[in-house]
Amino acid sequence: MIERFLTQTKFTSEDDYAKHLHFIVPENFNFAYDVMDAWAEEKPDKVALLWTSERGEEVSTTFREFKEQTDRTAAYFMQLGIKHGDKVMLILKRHYQWWLSMMALCKVGAIAIPA
């Protein structure tokens, strides 16, 4: 996937890297769609998110599950009236839902304000 966003991926030295590292950023780049959802297509059963609580609880989510959950969350946010360009303060402490909400807000085009 990295080839989609870099003009060159192999370098012979640190100097070569410094001189020739150039990013390709699509005009309407959206990390949630262009990276996370693309990974859901390429490797749907790989772990996208592994979250562990202080009590040792674990939540493991594949890229497919992550895409499905962020799609549903984005639809819910839009149902609430959140739209492209809206600023949304996200207060979820250290819960795994924070990551789902961040990506869902990206999908909506809203501006997430982590708090």
Language model features with spans:
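Conserved AMP-binding/adenylate-forming core of the ANL superfamily
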Residues: D45, L49-M103
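Anion (oxyanion) recognition and catalysis
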Residues: C106
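Structured binding elements
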Residues: G109
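Low-complexity, small/basic-enriched stretches
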Residues: M1-L21
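Active-site diphosphate/adenylate-binding microenvironment
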Residues: A18, H22-E27, R94
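A short N-terminal helical cap/helix-turn-helix that marks the beginning
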Residues: M1-Q8, E27-L49
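The conserved SAM/SAH-binding core of class I Rossmann-like methyltransferase domains
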Residues: A115
